[in-house]
C-alpha cells in the first residue's frame, strides 16, 4: 500500500527508486545558484525552424547571403529561440512544479548566438514570497544567464513564477504496468 508523502506524490513501492520530481516553493533559498545540467549545440535547422514557425521574416536569421554582408558574416540565431532554450534548460531546477509563469523582465542580449554555438545556463534565486491570492503556491524570482561554449554571456533576464507549496502539488498520473516486466536480477 502506498501513502502520500510531502510532495503530494505517492511513496514508492518497495524496491522502486523515485526520480527527480523538482523543487517546491519551500526548497528555494535566496542566494542559491543552480548550474543547469544540460547544454545544447544550436544547429542551423533549429534556428530556421523556430524562425519560420514564429513567422519571423528577418533576413538576419534566414538569409545566409544577406547575413554574409553584415558584420557577423553568418545568420544570427533568433533571440526568441535563445530565450526559449535557456528557459527550457532551467526547468529541471526551477519550474518542474510551476503553477504559472508571471513574467520575464530585463531581458538582455549582450552577445549574438550563431549556429554551432553550445548554450549552457545558470540561475540565482533572488527572492521568494508567499502568494497573497493563492495559498497553495509561492512566488519565486530568479536571475538567469545563458552562456556559450567560451563562457561568454549571450542572454540574461529576471523571471518570476508561481510554484506549488509542499503538500499542495496535484496528484500525478501514474502510467505503469500492473506487474513489473523487468527480469529479476541479483546484485
Where are these regions (language model features)?
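Short flexible/disordered coil segments
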Residues: 101-103, 128-135, 158-168
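Hydrophobic beta-sheet segments that form the core/acyl-binding groove
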Residues: 104-148
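Basic side chains
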Residues: 40, 108, 158-159
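Flexible glycine-rich active-site/ligand-binding loops centered on an Asp-His dyad
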Residues: 140-170, 176
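Hot-dog-fold acyl-thioester-processing enzymes
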Residues: 2-103, 155, 166-187
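Residues that cap or initiate secondary-structure elements
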Residues: 42, 113, 129, 150, ...
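A general secondary-structure signal for short beta-strands and their flanking turns/coil
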Residues: 33-35, 118, 137-139, 154-156
